[in-house]
Amino acid sequence: DHLAARRRTDLQQLLPAGPKIAFTGGADCADHAAIWDALDRVRAKHADMVLLHGGGPRGAERIAAAWADNRGVTQIVFKPDWTRHGKAAPFRRNDQLLQVLPIGLIVFPGSGITDNLADKARALGIPLFDFRPKPAPA
């Protein structure tokens, strides 16, 4: 739709240059080595990448933020607006992050909010680098 396209164009002008790579993972995910390795592999292909994440205070997103600080990678943090959106805040945050149209999404284990972001990204045709455990065959 026209308004969404215009909003996206306006948003793109405000963002730093470089391919946008989104990252998501839960507060209980603490696999530093795997997260740093995944981010290093993506950065090897996209040296000027910009990391998009939810700014979680602990867990996978905190580890990704520490990686970006260490590697000098630009970050854009999409924090949930709890005051404005209440319980829907993390889902609205997911929608805002995807409006940037990242070229890929790195997914580590998390909650239903993590799965929601992965599902929406897949529906938009955004490639997933999925590090969640595979379900056991039934």
Predicted features along the sequence, with ranges:
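Acidic/glycine-enriched connector segments
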Residues: 1-21, 29-138
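Positively charged, aromatic-accented nucleic-acid-binding surfaces
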Residues: 26
